[in-house]
Amino acid sequence: MAQPKVSILISFYNLAPYVDETLQSVLNQKTDFPIEVLCADDGSADNTVEKLRQWEKRYPETVRVFVMDFIPGEKRPPDVRIKRLNAIRNRLFREAQGTYICYLDGDDFYTDPYKLQKQADILDADTEKKYVACGHNGCFYWQSTGKTRPIEKPIRECSLTAKEYWSFLYIHTNALMFRNLRLQEIDPFASGVTIDDNLL
């Protein structure tokens, strides 16, 4: 397999109804570079793992599946679910070989077939910045009605400093692409840090 330029890291837990749409939206991306899709399941009780394995079998050069350790039928309070999500994202992050990384939740999908190409082009053009990321507007989508609604106020096209970003702007985690800090020997996941839909 060619060295991937972008690694898409996807976490799943009991999301079998969404697996196909999520992965199809990623694999339908139109890029002039290779990608890798790393999927982790956190002990789903439905057939999420079986569906993921089917995609891995169809696209062995692109899709890899990791099944996390779990106790069958284990009840997970919210704080445990967040810690597990951190562990999953950390595991996938350590496996990622791409120059750039995107996170995607297992029940979300890309709507723009050029999302990865557009964001990679922006990051490629900004070679002087070590810790650059870029994001875009996101929306809620209701399958039952086909209606959408912006997650937050629309983002205008602009460049922001870290201070500006953290002071007022929310960009959904799934809308971000950022440089693979691990390739720079930096670990952004400090143990014990609570992460809940934050930048990292």
Question: Which role does the model predict for each range below?
Answer:
Residues I101:
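Short aromatic/hydrophobic "clamp" motif used to bind/position activated sugar donors
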Residues D105-F109:
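The conserved acidic donor/metal-binding loop of glycosyltransferases
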Residues Y114-R149:
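Conserved donor NDP-sugar-binding/catalytic core segment of glycosyltransferases
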Residues L15-N28:
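Short, well-formed alpha-helical segments that are part of the catalytic scaffolds
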Residues F70-A96:
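Glycine-rich, basic loop-to-helix element that forms the pyrophosphate-binding segment
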Residues L85-N86, R94, I155-L200:
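Conserved nucleotide-sugar donor-binding catalytic segment
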Residues S25-P77:
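Acidic donor-binding segment of Leloir-type glycosyltransferases
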Residues P4-S7, E36, L199:
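Cell-envelope/extracellular polymer assembly enzymes that use nucleotide-activated donors
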